[in-house]
Amino acid sequence: MIDYKLFKKIEKYAQLHSQSSIDHYRKRNQNTDKILINCIAGKIGEFECYYSMINAGYKIKSPPDLAIYPDDDKSHAADMICVGKNDILYENEKHIHIKTVSFNTFKNYGISFLIEANDRLVKYPKDNHFYSVMIEESLTSYRFGKWICSTDVIWMPPKMNLPSKLACYL
């Protein structure tokens, strides 16, 4: 669970991130009022996944990043890199892309997530890249929903009218 001190850091990160990325979000026709909320939720989901994995014995390269990058330096890299579990180091690191799902979305669509249709992993999935779906339980608490390897995803059009997105329903 996220404590107050970490929540305030996440909130500050989300404010700075949403301000630095406003043009990017507008190009994708995203509601600017929801950007801050989605940014907070995404980062909380990342920390919840990180703590869950650490508690289960996984070795993670570094905690979630709270740095703000300029537009030309933003990447689509994994949110986390898992290098092993307990005393075993993986030969091939596991790249984890964390997707947070609100409770209402979970209620309406089950364990699912959206991604930009032009995302690199859609065209070029890799067997060491995974999606981790984190489901909202409260403002500062998410639970693990499901893992899926990027090579196993069956992409579909979203049930909502979102032409630039693809959906994965698990």
Question: What is each residue range found by the language model?
Answer:
Residues M1-A77, I81-L170:
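Nucleic-acid endonuclease domains
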